[in-house]
Amino acid sequence: MSQSLIVALDFPGKQEVEQFLHHFEGEELFVKVGMELFYKEGPAIITYLKEKGHKIFLDLKLHDIPNTVKSAMRSLASLDVDMVNVHAAGGSSMMKAAIEGLEEGKQEGKERPICIAVTQLTSTSEAMMKKEIGIEKTLEEAVAHYAKLTKESGLDGVVCSTLEVPKLREVCGNEFVTVTPGIRLASDDVNDQVRVATPKRARELGSSYIVVGRSITKAENPLEAYKTVKQQWEGVTV
């Protein structure tokens, strides 16, 4: 199964995670652990998932003063997760400090986790960004600005919507990682996200990774839903 397809484990606790992963016995997934699950279960949930052979994107979106973020990243790297993130709005000094913390905390003999920055949440519309956040640029311009700053700060890539990926390829190059949430099958509700796309569209626009939650986790048959998403994402029959 594809390692560029990340399944969002947006569950309240370990019991629900176990029930969900029962559908994937013997498979090694790339999963996302967010705030709700990590704050409830703590580092033990990371240990559990690593023992199952899964890769982990720990999605905590750190945003604080540089020294605090550096210390936090040092701790997160020691958990042997595969990907972490910060908010690009925290600035260059904070992002550089995040990398320093990851380098200091990584396990011996292993590479540091991939570190990406959130540009704008996929729940943010351009009108909201201008009115409530006070950024007068277009949404694409704001995302491109943050992405360029992220790259200059030494991070590996950004979280963004699929719609911004082509512009970021122009600004930051093809090696720059783009992780795109807001992925839905055409038959699904968009829920609380504004900038959404299908797996096929994400592939066409050039996303590096896609993050898929409810389309898989809320499906009657999660494994079949996963295979459907994978087929659309990779453009192959599974």
From Swiss-Prot:
- Pathway assigned to this chain's UniProt record: Pyrimidine metabolism; UMP biosynthesis via de novo pathway; UMP from orotate: step 2/2
Please indicate which superkingdom the organism of origin belongs to: Bacteria
Keyword Transmembrane helix set for record = no
* Keyword terms: Decarboxylase, Lyase, Pyrimidine biosynthesis
> For substrate, which residues are the binding ones?
10, 32, 59-68, 122, 184, 193, 213-214
Q: What does the record give as EC number? A: 4.1.1.23
Query: Any coiled-coil ranges, and where?
Result: none
Keyword Lyase in annotation: yes
Q: What class of enzyme is it?
A: lyase
- What Pfam families does the record tag this protein with? OMPdecase
Q: What residues make up the catalytic site? A: 61 (proton donor)
Task: From the UniProt annotation, give the residues forming the signal peptide.
Answer: none
**Which Gene Ontology BP annotations are present?**
'de novo' pyrimidine nucleobase biosynthetic process; 'de novo' UMP biosynthetic process
Q: What does it catalyze? A: orotidine 5'-phosphate + H(+) = UMP + CO2
Q: Which GO terms describe its molecular function?
A: orotidine-5'-phosphate decarboxylase activity
Tell me the subunit arrangement.
Homodimer.
Which HAMAP family is this protein grouped with?
OMPdecase_type1_B
Give the UniProt family note.
Belongs to the OMP decarboxylase family. Type 1 subfamily.
- Protein name per UniProt: Orotidine 5'-phosphate decarboxylase
Whose protein is this, by species? Answer: Bacillus cereus (strain ATCC 14579 / DSM 31 / CCUG 7414 / JCM 2152 / NBRC 15305 / NCIMB 9373 / NCTC 2599 / NRRL B-3711)
Q: Which gene encodes it?
A: pyrF
